[in-house]
A protein has these predicted regions:
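Gly/Ser-rich oxyanion-binding loop with an adjacent helix/lid
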Residues: 1-71, 196-197, 223-226
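Glycine/serine-rich anion-binding loops at beta->alpha junctions
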Residues: 1-5, 199-215
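Short alpha-helical patches at coil-to-helix transitions and adjacent helical residues
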Residues: 2-6, 38-41, 146, 150, ...
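C-terminal nucleotide
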Residues: 50-204, 216-226
Length: 226
């Protein structure tokens, strides 16, 4: 809503909207008037969205690029099932998990202050050679795994390998559930139903959005069955 209002005001005043300015205004309004710390890259996603492409963000440099969608003129699609969960219902848990992940990554960064997380020796973490507790190790491993999966998906998109795209999506969802322990009964139920549907090759819970979603890689012919 904030993005829409920001763009509408620019149009109403006859101004040419500068994307970075609109994003900053939306971010500040969310914080000042709603006490919400909204991710700026999500606002940029909405402002830069183009039909037929995905956005791949580089969180290290704050840059992004468009990646052509492999689903154009294909018999597969990414389907979204809306959980219709009241946003307030999960807000507290999402904040708690966000702070938990942030604290874990900061603990890891302090061990190798001179090395960027992008070049972090993940093998040392997996082999338990670093003095961190098990919870921190598990969370950090998932963050690195998620980053690598995003790069893998870019390659799979180029290859139009829908089955492997579905498997990668399921891997992310499984990590959220098992390693971050972020769950929601309603969304878990929708995700489980998708796996049981013939023609669905993978799914993951997506907590961004009004009521939570389940994203699925599915054959178009399987929509009705789901």
């Amino acid at each position: 809503i904030g993005v829409g209002v920001g763009m509408a005001l620019y149009r109403l005043l006859g101004l040419e909207p500068d994307v970075s300015v609109v994003a900053s205004c939306c971010f500040n309004s969310c914080f000042r008037f709603c006490s919400e710390l909204y991710n700026r890259h999500l606002i940029l996603t909405m402002l830069h969205a183009k039909e037929g492409s995905f956005l791949l963000f580089d969180m290290h440099d704050g840059l992004f690029r468009h990646v052509d969608s492999p689903f154009r003129n294909a018999d597969f699609s990414i389907a979204l099932a809306n959980g219709n969960i009241p946003p307030l219902a999960m807000r507290e848990e999402l904040y708690f998990k966000h702070n938990l992940v942030k604290s874990a990554m900061e603990s890891l960064a302090n061990l190798h202050a001179s090395v960027s997380l992008r070049r972090f020796p993940v093998e040392d973490l997996l082999d338990r050679q670093l003095p961190v507790d098990e919870e921190t190790r598990t969370i950090c491993c998932y963050v690195f795994e998620e980053s690598n999966t995003a790069l893998l998906l870019e390659r799979l998109f180029a290859q139009k390998d829908f089955i492997q795209i579905g498997k990668a999506l399921s891997k992310l969802g499984k990590g959220l559930r098992d390693k971050i322990e972020l769950t929601c009964p309603e969304l878990d139920w929708l995700s489980k139903r998708s796996i049981e549907t013939p023609g669905c090759y993978g799914s993951s819970i997506v907590y961004n959005g009004a009521g939570g979603y389940v994203a699925m890689v599915m054959e178009d012919a399987s929509f009705d069955a789901y």
